Amino acid sequence: MQKRELYEIADGKLVRKHRFCPRCGPGVFLAEHADRYSCGRCGYTEFKKAKKSKS
């Protein structure tokens, strides 16, 4: 994936589609997986919250 694919223009402003890594700082994005976000540079991982189903 190229860096230009991680941004979009909305209402004349540049908007990031992904989040930055809190350890590495701006410019290093977190990859989005089905159950987690992970940094390919430092290995930082955040797990997504599981949605509770109504029963």
From Swiss-Prot:
Pfam families associated with the record: Ribosomal_S27
ZnF start-end (C4-type): 21-42
Q: Name the InterPro entries for this protein.
A: Ribosomal_eS31, Ribosomal_eS31_arc, Ribosomal_zn-bd
A cellular component annotation (GO) from this entry:
ribosome
Q: Which domain of life is it from?
A: Archaea
> Coiled coil where?
none
- Gene Ontology MF annotations: structural constituent of ribosome; zinc ion binding
Residue intervals passing through the bilayer: none
Single GO biological process annotation from the record:
translation
Cofactor: how bound: Binds 1 zinc ion per subunit.
Q: Which cofactor does it need?
A: Zn(2+)
What is the disulfide pattern of this chain? none
**Residue numbers binding Zn(2+):** C21, C24, C39, C42
Keyword list, A-Z = Metal-binding, Ribonucleoprotein, Ribosomal protein, Zinc, Zinc-finger
> Quaternary structure?
Part of the 30S ribosomal subunit.
User: Which family is this sequence assigned to?
Assistant: Belongs to the eukaryotic ribosomal protein eS31 family.
- Protein name per its UniProtKB record: Small ribosomal subunit protein eS31
